[in-house]
C-alpha cells in the first residue's frame, strides 16, 4: 500500500474507534447522563409501597406434592427383604 491509502485506512479506523468510544448507550427509560425519568421512578416507588404482589388465580386441579423422605426409608419400603 502506498502512503495515501495507508493514511485513508488510518483515518477511517480512527473515526470508527472514536464513534464507539464516545457514543452513549441509550436504554429505555434513561435520559442522557444516566438519569432515569421521574415518571418511571415514581411508578416504581408506588409499586414498592403496595408490595408489588399480584394475586395469582388458583388452579382447580392442583395437588400438594408429597413430602420427600430420606433415601433409606424409601428403599426399605420397596425392598422389604433387606
From Swiss-Prot:
PTM-bearing positions, type Glycine amide: 33
Cellular component terms per the entry's GO annotation: extracellular space
Signal sequence segment: 1-23
Job description of the protein: Stimulates the secretion of gonadotropins.
Native species: Oncorhynchus masou
Origin superkingdom: Eukaryota
GO molecular function: gonadotropin hormone-releasing hormone activity; gonadotropin-releasing hormone receptor binding
One protein family per Pfam: GnRH
Chief localization: secreted
Family statement drawn from the similarity comment of this UniProt entry: Belongs to the GnRH family.
Gene name in the database record: gnrh3
Protein's name in the database: Progonadoliberin-3
Record-listed Pyrrolidone carboxylic acid modification sites: 24
